[in-house]
Amino acid sequence: MKEQWLEKVIERNRLGNCQIEIINSVIKKQWECDLLIEDEVHLFASPSFSTIFNVVKYKLILCLTGTLERLDGKEELIKKYAPVCDKITMDEAVKNGWVSPFTEYVVMIKTDLTEYNELNKRFNAYFSYFGWDFQTAMKSVQDVFFRKKWCKENNLNFKEATAMTYDWMRCLRLRKQFVQSHPKKIEIARKIINARKDKKILTFSATIADAEKIGTGLVLHSKQSKKLNEKILEEFKQMKSGVINSSKALITGCDIEGLDTEIILSINSSKITKTQSVGRAIRFSPGKKAEIFTLIIAGTQEFGWWRNSKTSSNYVIIDEEQLDDILAGNEIQSRKIDDNSNINFRF
């Protein structure tokens, strides 16, 4: 990110009165400036990063982010120092030519849900013990002192509550693993890659292991050295077509010229993650129209996660047969979801 900002500042011959630093360095000492610009400001709500508002003395502040909303609600801290003054939707950005036009194909994958349904049944049974309160259940997992206090306040047996807590967490993890790392997604991803051999493709998977299972193209992840990852990324940037596979390492701040196809094998409810991942493929380039393929296991909670995370109306929900038509260059009948549902799919 710092390198990208530096490149743009040098292009505009503004290096003389502009200093670019990463947040980790800024919070270590006192600063003074006329204008403070904070990019990816949604990250600055953490206890350490939020000290930037105290260590920097500024006259004006400009904060930028793809999506300010956080699942933990801590964006309110940022708003205290920098209230929202303008909001640009993805549709508006496309209309004004700030990003390239794109279509997101939401591929609903049908598969045997026997295992998932059993996990979901057990998950709901354990969840009901906590009154369907996610925060209570999660705090019980993370904080034994909270669990003891909660048991005392509700006249519950601590040993039983502990068992329920970890059984609930286990089912939550296994249910998520079932949908995010399903083998059928690897199969569909390979099909898309084979049909788009002339494209520059980025894939996002739930885990490093899943990224490696795709079995074609380059793999970039956090367990490799920074030097090796830089070499891999530079190699991909020089390619006219090809594939680079990742889990989370390329979600933020990566600018790859020519990237026009993205396959998302793993999603959650976060608008931030969704906006940033889609942003990799829609960086503006004249004449480019990007394709985003989001793979979802039909009949599971994953569809609700996608619905909560979506930030654009440029989507088409399709099945596997319709995907085959799209990959073959044929027209399909599009359909959109009913957004009037009041069901909470967050978890």
Regions found by a protein language model. Give the residues of each.
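Inter-Walker segment of RecA-like/P-loop motor cores
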Residues: K2-E32
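Conserved interdomain hinge at the start of the Helicase C-terminal
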Residues: E118-S128, R170-K213
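Inter-lobe connector of SF1/SF2 helicase motors
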Residues: S100-T165
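Conserved helicase ATPase core of P-loop NTP-dependent helicases/translocases
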Residues: K2-V9, K200-F204, A209-C254, T273
